[in-house]
UniProtKB/Swiss-Prot annotation:
Gene Ontology terms: cellular component: cytosolic large ribosomal subunit
Protein name per its UniProtKB record: Large ribosomal subunit protein bL12
GO BP terms in the entry: translation
Keywords linked to the UniProt accession: Ribonucleoprotein, Ribosomal protein
Designated gene of the protein: rplL
Family: Belongs to the bacterial ribosomal protein bL12 family.
Record's function text: Forms part of the ribosomal stalk which helps the ribosome interact with GTP-bound translation factors. Is thus essential for accurate translation.
Quaternary structure annotation from Swiss-Prot or TrEMBL: Homodimer. Part of the ribosomal stalk of the 50S ribosomal subunit. Forms a multimeric L10(L12)X complex, where L10 forms an elongated spine to which 2 to 4 L12 dimers bind in a sequential fashion. Binds GTP-bound translation factors.
GO molecular function: mRNA binding; structural constituent of ribosome
């Protein structure tokens, strides 16, 4: 019998195709599925919890406005993202900038982004 470490080492050495076949074989052998219903349930529970307490807020960039460069600079400052990542985020609005933060911090971020010319929502 193989130890857990030996199994992990064997999995590390497999190709993506081999891993896919392994997952299918495990699903068939044990009658389980690798789908993620747990993630869906976890997301729903987190949403219900946030609605009940409302102590955590999300800052959503609704629109970058006309001064995208200023908005990108502020997004980089707030998130610590690189230039390309911040530009992609600003170009593909609406997108969350920060999630699960206190109301005071959300208001500060909103003010900074609006000062740069962006339209922002707090949810």
């Amino acid at each position: 019998m193989m130890t857990k470490e030996q199994i992990i080492e064997a999995v590390k050495n497999m190709t993506v195709l081999e891993l896919n076949e392994l997952v299918k074989a495990i699903e068939e052998e044990f009658g389980v599925t690798a789908a993620a219903p747990v993630v869906v349930a976890g997301g729903a529970a987190a949403g219900a919890e946030a609605a009940a307490e409302k102590t955590e807020f999300d800052v959503i960039l609704a629109d970058a406005g006309a001064q995208k460069i200023k908005v990108i600079k502020v997004v980089r400052e707030i998130t610590g993202l690189g230039l390309k990542e911040a530009k992609d985020l600003v170009d593909n609005t609406p997108k969350p900038i920060k999630e699960g933060i206190a109301k005071e911090e959300a208001e500060e971020i909103k003010a900074k982004l609006e000062e740069a010319g962006a339209k922002v929502e707090i949810k």
